[in-house]
């Protein structure tokens, strides 16, 4: 009522100044006080330029003067000074959103929250993780502040741009999250005592003689006992992760699409292991990375792909796409599943470049920080099951590739060398290929080239 009176008086007088408005406010409040015989104080605005300098409490006529300053230096428009003089700013609130996750990824599952409501976070600090078909992506806080609330739940499907959390960035931000309080359980009402049935005096009835009971039936034949199923409380049902779903779908598609066939060979690892043992210290000192066996097989695979380019090709509809580059994927097992990062232009790399690239990609894959771009593409895959102790296996093709090489564990076996039986470090290698595109002859030649280069690495120097 006071505010409407102020604006009504100001509009009638045609005055828009702060001082005129202040007088209107004072006169209207005095009138109200006189009507209700109130002794409450009135507010008077003392303008100074474009700032409200102070408010004073003054008593009504006949009361002693008593004044004190309420606020100093309040700045704003005339409407703000009169409409919201005592409101407090609750602070800025920013919202954390789902980032862009790659060209081929449209959504993901919110896997876990890394913070709780009420926790303080810094700018760019991870507050949640999104699991996609390929990688795990962090959601970062856009600014420093305190998490007020989360707008989604774990397990929800989210898309780029969806809001995930509200974060207060005010200086005195505090958590407004109260501990969950359980509603007091009301005691269950006590059951009322059953109503007593009226007693009825029964008259004695003459008892009839009982009929003779029939003879008991013969015992039935016992059927075979059904097998006891394990109790349900000893089983756990866990939803599949998006990565596991994606792997399952791709492997089944590979099995349904390709004419899978696997051929095997065995490789004598003596010379490659001798080369590694002889130069590993000098290699580490110069390049800052250890010399492993994987780089030797990558170089051998590059040479074999150059000798048999059809293994590096792929069927696309009614066409065959021949790739004039060699991008080799390496299978890396992680706690969350299998990922396959790519070594780009492996045909242009030396041993040191390959080892550095493998170590960097494997570290990112293990830590879950590998990007979508680092796993896209690839023309051929090398999988090393030997690090887990696998003796032999039949790997499955990684679409849209046409072949995959499987390495296995190195085992000392008796071999005939120069007419004598000697122990040799041997490895089985397997090539699974799409028989629609690759004939058995090309597959055998490919594996034979792998065997020749690994058993005699000097071939790489002479290009023979």
From Swiss-Prot:
Its main location: mitochondrion. GO terms for molecular function: dihydrolipoyllysine-residue succinyltransferase activity; salicylic acid binding; zinc ion binding. PROSITE patterns: BIOTINYL_LIPOYL, LIPOYL. GO terms for cellular component: cytosolic ribosome; mitochondrion; oxoglutarate dehydrogenase complex; plastid. InterPro entries: 2-oxoA_DH_lipoyl-BS, 2-oxoacid_dehydrogenase, 2-oxoacid_DH_actylTfrase, Biotin_lipoyl, CAT-like_dom_sf, Single_hybrid_motif, SucB. Its cofactor is (R)-lipoate. Pathway: Amino-acid degradation; L-lysine degradation via saccharopine pathway; glutaryl-CoA from L-lysine: step 6/6. It is an enzyme of class 2 (transferase). Binds 1 lipoyl cofactor covalently. It is found in: Mitochondrion. Its EC number is 2.3.1.61. GO terms for biological process: L-lysine catabolic process to acetyl-CoA via saccharopine; tricarboxylic acid cycle. Keywords: Acyltransferase, Lipoyl, Mitochondrion, Transferase, Transit peptide, Tricarboxylic acid cycle. Residues 93-168 form the Lipoyl-binding domain. It catalyses: N(6)-[(R)-dihydrolipoyl]-L-lysyl-[protein] + succinyl-CoA = N(6)-[(R)-S(8)-succinyldihydrolipoyl]-L-lysyl-[protein] + CoA. The active site is at 435, 439. Residues 1-86 form a transit peptide. The modification N6-lipoyllysine is found at residue 134. Forms a 24-polypeptide structural core with octahedral symmetry. The 2-oxoglutarate dehydrogenase complex catalyzes the overall conversion of 2-oxoglutarate to succinyl-CoA and CO(2). It contains multiple copies of three enzymatic components: 2-oxoglutarate dehydrogenase (E1), dihydrolipoamide succinyltransferase (E2) and lipoamide dehydrogenase (E3). Belongs to the 2-oxoacid dehydrogenase family. This is Dihydrolipoyllysine-residue succinyltransferase component of 2-oxoglutarate dehydrogenase complex 1, mitochondrial. It comes from Arabidopsis thaliana (Mouse-ear cress).
């Amino acid at each position: 009522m006071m505010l409407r009176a102020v604006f009504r008086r100001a509009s009638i007088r045609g005055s828009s100044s702060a001082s005129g408005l202040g007088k209107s406010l004072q006169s209207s409040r005095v009138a109200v006080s006189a009507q209700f015989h109130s002794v409450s104080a009135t507010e008077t605005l003392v303008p100074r330029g474009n700032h409200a300098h102070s408010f004073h409490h003054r008593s009504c006529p006949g009361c002693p003067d008593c004044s004190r300053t309420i606020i100093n230096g309040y700045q704003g428009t005339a409407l703000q000074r009169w409409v919201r003089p005592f409101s407090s700013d609750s602070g800025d609130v920013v919202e954390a959103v789902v980032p862009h996750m790659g060209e081929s990824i449209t959504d993901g599952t919110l896997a876990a929250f890394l913070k709780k409501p009420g926790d303080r976070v810094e700018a760019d600090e991870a507050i949640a993780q999104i699991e996609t078909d390929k990688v795990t992506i962090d959601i970062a806080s856009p600014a420093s502040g305190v998490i007020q609330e989360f707008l989604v739940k774990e397990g929800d499907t989210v898309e780029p741009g969806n809001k995930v959390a509200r974060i207060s960035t005010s200086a005195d931000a505090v958590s407004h999250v109260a501990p969950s309080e359980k509603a007091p359980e009301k005691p269950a009402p006590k059951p009322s005592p059953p109503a007593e049935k009226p007693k009825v005096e029964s008259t004695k009835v003459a008892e009839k003689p009982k009929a003779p009971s029939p003879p008991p039936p013969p015992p039935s034949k016992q059927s075979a006992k059904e097998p006891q199923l394990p109790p349900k409380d000893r089983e756990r049902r866990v939803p599949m992760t998006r990565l596991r779903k994606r792997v399952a779908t791709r492997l089944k598609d590979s099995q349904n699409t390709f004419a899978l066939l696997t051929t095997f060979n065995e490789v004598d690892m003596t010379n490659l292991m001798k080369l590694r043992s002889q130069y590993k210290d000098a290699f580490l000192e110069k390049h800052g990375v250890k010399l492993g066996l994987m780089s030797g097989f990558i170089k051998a695979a590059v040479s074999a792909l150059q000798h048999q380019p059809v293994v590096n090709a792929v069927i696309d509809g009614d066409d065959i796409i021949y790739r004039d580059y060699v991008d080799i994927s390496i299978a890396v097992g992680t706690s969350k599943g299998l990922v396959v990062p790519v070594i780009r232009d492996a045909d242009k790399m030396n041993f040191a470049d390959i080892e550095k690239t493998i170590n960097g990609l494997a570290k990112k894959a293990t830590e879950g920080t590998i990007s979508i771009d680092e796993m896209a593409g690839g023309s051929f895959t090398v999988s090393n099951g030997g690090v887990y102790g696998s003796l032999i296996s039949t790997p499955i093709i990684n679409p849209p590739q046409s072949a995959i090489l499987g390495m296995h564990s190195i085992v000392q076996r008796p071999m005939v060398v120069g007419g004598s039986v000697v122990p040799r470090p041997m490895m089985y290698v397997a090539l699974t290929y799409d028989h629609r595109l690759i004939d058995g002859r090309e597959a055998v030649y490919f594996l034979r080239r792998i065997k020749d280069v690994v058993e005699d690495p000097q071939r790489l120097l002479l290009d023979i």
